């Protein structure tokens, strides 16, 4: 079902008055969640955030009833089609989403297979066919593979009819057995290259070229030095033309995390790595038969924020391919810490030429007596160099294919697949490090700005279903926007780009996001401050638009966002001045909520006021007679400043503080006297009732001859005196006092809820969020 939500209309603003009478002796504590107002926030913090209520108008959703796990996405630009692999189903949707009914293939698991799956100890929800691979074979057919209730199957689909999966065959070694197993696959030259596990238990990892019969595949050796409990992330192909080497071979790169065999501590250390094989590899004639002779791997280093320590888990890797002739691709990876409780995400960029340089460097040899790796000396490396693709220079040496390589070369590469040096990120450090967001997926594309300069824009999917849009400026990523994607938090499982649209797959749906939605930026300053390479302010249209390379009458500033020099001075919007009545000495927090987390804010207050404490949520003021007056929060970004919030601090009912204090004291004395009088009358009535009951008992004793002067045996005497008040009751004279069925003197409509602690009174119906009586 396709659905497009309408843009929500803003409701009426609340009146700028307090809808309740000022309290007599309560401290008014203002507290809201807002952007920081003191200090400079890092660019890893999103500049703006759109909750689901605002973001929903920019999203288009697709979901089929009773269908889940929309995790496999494939975009076919030629046919403008998005293929979606879900649980037991495959869909074909026209791009961009337009409401057209999608085509669907149901690829169900027979009940006999499901019974066998359950007999193997698997849960009912696991015994389905989770689609894991979708790949374009040619213009007429797709290849697809699914888990098929822990018995992987593969088949082809005729895209013109799109009715069923045909020519089924075993998918073992191509597709994982369950969706929780990380895998990767890529099609190169009509051939499928995969990285997955080969057995039911998931203990035999394999990187293979799946052509023909399984026994004829070229695959990795079953040695822990080759692959040691890997979690595969991505697979990518680079052609020789992208290297500028027309005589070379296609190279397939696999990105994964595996357990290190080098024991630097008592814990199992996870290491992110990249491996490479050559498309023309035929294996060895005797040694490494049906095995890769070009398999090399190296560490990927993405230093963490603490002591330069590398992040140990690779979560995702995206490839950004420039236009033909505009340079080599670049890889963007998301890294996280392997240690529980360390919520660290880092984004690093890697250049293919840096990876190739490491693969051409020294090998590492693992010394079994010390469990540490040492570099192999150059004079110990045989010739021709092990692990190289067969190129023209090797053919000149009579090595026409890998089948003609000598055994000493094959033996060396079998025993030394790991390189000694790591691959460092471009610029030597991460582009982005955050300690409060868990990134799971990434895609990237290159956008040309109004000036003609190109910028890389990254889309980062989070663990709780948010989308962060970031632009790379120099050696830093600046997170421009946080977009909530789903009504309920859920991980982002897959992402694909199609022109100006981003397709996001999750457990419950596929979401289409417009990546060039400039129209929501309503003013010149908002358009410039957004720093979006796609958007520019048009003076002719008086709107923020996607510039599409047009320069006339448009302005944009990606790196400086200098509003003051590009935009005309906009009429200032003065916020409503909220009057804040206070009645006793205490602390008041005045909120300041700028629209941008990157804005720097200052407070203007009455002269002579010094008892002020800037906070992340506003300004804390110590209430004194000298603190009364006007307060304003002014925020600046891009050279433009405006007042965000304004307050007037006054004594409760516009009377002087001394008269107010006298009134409070007088009211307190009157209340105390009335309380004493009421207590005396109550005790008198209780005494009279007890006396009358005693007289009736004495008369009854005279009649039956019983002595009620002492308690009967087996009972305990007790006193009828009222219990003394508890210390908690004595702390809360205001909370216990009621007037007009209200609480603490406030009428019932402004009571929010019962307080978890009787020392806190919560109010509603006004910008005063919290009253804390314990601060009085």
Curated annotation (Swiss-Prot):
Ranges of the Extracellular topological domain: 40-665
Residues carrying covalently attached carbohydrate according to the record: 69, 138, 514
Gene3D superfamilies (UniProt xref): ligand-binding face of the semaphorins, domain 2 (3.30.1680.10), YVTN repeat-like/Quinoprotein amine dehydrogenase (2.130.10.10)
Chief location of this protein within or outside the cell: membrane
Residues carrying Phosphoserine: 724, 726
A Pfam family this chain is assigned to: Sema4F_C
Domain PSI per the UniProt entry, residue ranges: 517-568
Subcellular location: Cell membrane; Postsynaptic density; Perikaryon; Cell projection, Dendrite
Protein name: Semaphorin-4F
Species per Swiss-Prot/TrEMBL record: Rattus norvegicus
């Amino acid at each position: 079902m396709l659905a497009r939500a309408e843009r929500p209309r803003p409701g009426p603003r609340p009146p700028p008055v307090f809808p309740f009478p000022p309290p007599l002796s309560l401290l008014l504590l203002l507290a809201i969640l807002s952007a920081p107002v003191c200090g400079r926030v890092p660019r890893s913090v999103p500049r703006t955030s759109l909750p689901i209520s605002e973001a929903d108008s920019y999203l288009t959703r697709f979901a089929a009833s009773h269908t889940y796990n929309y995790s496999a996405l494939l975009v076919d630009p030629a046919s403008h089609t998005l293929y979606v692999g879900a649980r037991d189903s495959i869909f074909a949707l026209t791009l961009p989403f337009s409401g057209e009914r999608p085509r669907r293939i149901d690829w169900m698991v027979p009940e006999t297979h499901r019974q066998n799956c359950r007999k193997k100890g698997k849960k009912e929800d696991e015994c389905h066919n989770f689609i894991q691979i979708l790949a374009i074979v040619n213009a007429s057919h797709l290849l697809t593979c699914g888990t098929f209730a822990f018995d992987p199957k593969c088949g082809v689909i005729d895209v013109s009819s799109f009715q069923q999966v045909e020519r089924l065959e075993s998918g073992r070694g191509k597709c994982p057995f369950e969706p929780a197993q990380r895998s990767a696959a890529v099609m190169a030259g009509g051939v499928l290259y995969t990285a997955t596990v080969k057995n039911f238990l998931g203990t035999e990892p394999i990187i293979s070229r799946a052509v023909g019969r399984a026994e004829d595949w070229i695959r990795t050796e079953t040695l822990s030095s080759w692959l040691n409990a890997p979690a595969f992330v991505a697979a990518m192909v680079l052609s020789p033309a992208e290297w500028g080497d027309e005589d070379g071979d296609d190279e397939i790169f696999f990105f994964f995390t595996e357990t290190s065999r080098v024991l630097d501590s008592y814990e199992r250390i996870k290491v992110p790595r990249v491996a490479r094989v050559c498309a023309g590899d035929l294996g060895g004639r005797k040694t490494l038969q049906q095995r890769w002779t070009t398999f090399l791997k190296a560490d990927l280093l993405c230093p963490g924020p603490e002591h330069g320590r590398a992040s140990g888990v690779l979560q995702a890797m995206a490839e950004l391919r420039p236009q033909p002739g505009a340079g080599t691709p670049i890889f963007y990876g998301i890294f996280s810490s392997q240690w529980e409780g360390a919520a660290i995400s880092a984004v690093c960029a890697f250049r293919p030429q840096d990876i190739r340089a490491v693969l051409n460097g020294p090998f590492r040899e693992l010394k079994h007596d010390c469990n540490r790796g040492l570099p192999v000396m150059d004079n110990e490396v045989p010739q021709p160099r092990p692990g190289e693709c067969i190129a023209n220079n090797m053919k000149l040496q009579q090595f026409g294919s890998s089948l003609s390589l000598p055994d000493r070369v094959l033996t060396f590469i079998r025993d030394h697949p790991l390189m000694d040096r790591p691959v460092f990120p471009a610029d030597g450090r991460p582009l982005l490090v955050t300690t409060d967001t868990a990134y799971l997926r990434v895609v990237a594309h290159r956008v040309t700005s109004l000036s003609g300069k190109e910028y890389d824009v990254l889309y980062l999917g989070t663990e709780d279903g948010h989308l962060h849009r970031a632009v790379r400026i120099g050696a830093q990523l600046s997170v421009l926007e946080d977009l909530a994607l789903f009504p309920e938090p859920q991980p982002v499982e897959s992402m694909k780009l199609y022109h100006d649209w981003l397709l996001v797959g999750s457990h419950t749906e596929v979401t289409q996001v417009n990546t060039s939605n400039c129209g929501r930026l309503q003013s010149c300053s908002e358009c410039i401050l957004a720093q979006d390479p796609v958007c520019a302010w048009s003076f002719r249209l008086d709107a923020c638009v996607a510039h599409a390379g047009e320069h006339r009458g448009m302005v944009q500033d990606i790196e400086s966002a200098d509003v003051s020099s590009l935009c005309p001075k906009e009429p200032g919007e003065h916020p409503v001045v909220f009057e804040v009545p206070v009645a006793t000495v205490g602390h008041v927090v005045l909120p300041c909520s700028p629209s941008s987390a990157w804005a720097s804010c200052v407070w203007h207050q009455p002269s002579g006021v010094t008892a002020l404490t800037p906070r992340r949520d506003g300004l804390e003021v110590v209430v004194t007679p000298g603190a009364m007056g006007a307060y304003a929060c002014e925020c600046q970004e891009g050279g433009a400043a405006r007042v965000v919030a304004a307050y007037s601090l006054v004594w409760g009912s516009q009377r002087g503080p001394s008269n107010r204090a006298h009134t409070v004291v007088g009211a307190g004395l009157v209340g105390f006297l009335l309380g004493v009088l009421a207590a005396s009358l109550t005790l008198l009535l209780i005494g009279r009732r007890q006396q009358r009951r005693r007289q009736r008992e004495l008369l009854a004793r005279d009649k039956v001859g019983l002595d009620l002067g002492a308690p009967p045996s087996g009972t305990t005497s007790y006193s009828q005196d009222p219990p003394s008040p508890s210390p908690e009751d004595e702390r809360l004279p205001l909370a216990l006092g009621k007037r007009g069925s209200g609480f603490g003197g406030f009428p019932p409509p402004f009571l929010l809820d019962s307080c978890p602690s009787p020392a806190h009174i919560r109010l509603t119906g006004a910008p005063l969020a919290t009253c804390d009586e314990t601060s009085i």
